[in-house]
């Protein structure tokens, strides 16, 4: 999993508050370092026999809305990435994770709806396919990539039928697990409830940790 780190894509003359702040983002720098850094890193990983999942620079702001500045940012990032000749030639090995850890996703007017996730990410999928990229697209959910129920009602559609969902798995998100209270069946039941498409589609876990609370007991 390659993070196109914003320390390269941000204009050094501008100050970004955190990785969710895209005010310092420079498309010119992104295009430059896509060629000078990110694609060479991808090539090196492939030379080592790895498949590469690429995520965009930074993380989602806590609240995002359909058609907002961050939505346009994701479309611009992936439009440039998906149009690249090398990326297209290696689309069987390189896949795209649309965003990192959306938290709360709203309609364009800021209201809540079970259509918001679909309406936010469907246009990003469409933008990628419009460039001719045919590789796998991994779609994130809400709640830091732990909530996917809304996609069961409003699923993503894909002209290539070559997409699924990227999920983050931290034990507390699927049943408040602790060292003293960890039940595999509870975890599995909650995971199936929160990520219902796990029953019908291959799921990619792009972050996972189950470290003991007391590291001396590891």
Model-predicted segments: where are they?
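Aromatic-lined substrate-binding rim segments of carbohydrate-active enzymes
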Residues: 1-60, 73-75, 117, 122-132, ...
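Extracellular glycoside hydrolase catalytic/binding regions
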Residues: 65-95, 99-218
């Amino acid at each position: 999993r390659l993070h196109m780190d914003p320390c390269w894509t941000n204009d050094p003359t501008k100050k970004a508050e955190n990785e969710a702040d895209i005010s310092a983002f420079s498309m010119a720098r992104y295009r430059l370092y896509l060629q000078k850094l990110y694609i060479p890193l991808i090539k090196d990983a492939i030379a080592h026999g790895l498949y590469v999942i690429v995520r965009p620079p930074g993380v989602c702001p806590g609240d995002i809305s359909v058609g907002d500045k961050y939505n346009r940012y994701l479309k611009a990032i992936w439009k440039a990435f998906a149009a690249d000749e090398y990326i297209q030639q290696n689309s069987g090995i390189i896949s795209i994770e649309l965003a990192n850890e959306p938290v709360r996703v709203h309609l364009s007017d800021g209201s809540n709806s079970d259509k918001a996730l679909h309406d936010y990410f469907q246009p990003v999928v469409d933008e990628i396919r419009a460039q001719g990229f045919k590789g796998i697209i991994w779609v994130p959910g809400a709640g830091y990539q732990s909530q996917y129920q809304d996609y069961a009602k409003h699923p993503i559609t894909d002209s290539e039928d070559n997409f699924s969902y990227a999920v983050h798995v931290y034990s507390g998100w699927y049943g408040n697990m602790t060292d003293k209270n960890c039940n595999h069946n509870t975890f599995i039941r909650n995971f199936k409830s929160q990520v219902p498409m796990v029953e019908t589609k291959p799921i990619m876990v792009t972050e996972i940790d189950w470290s003991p609370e007391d590291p001396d007991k590891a």
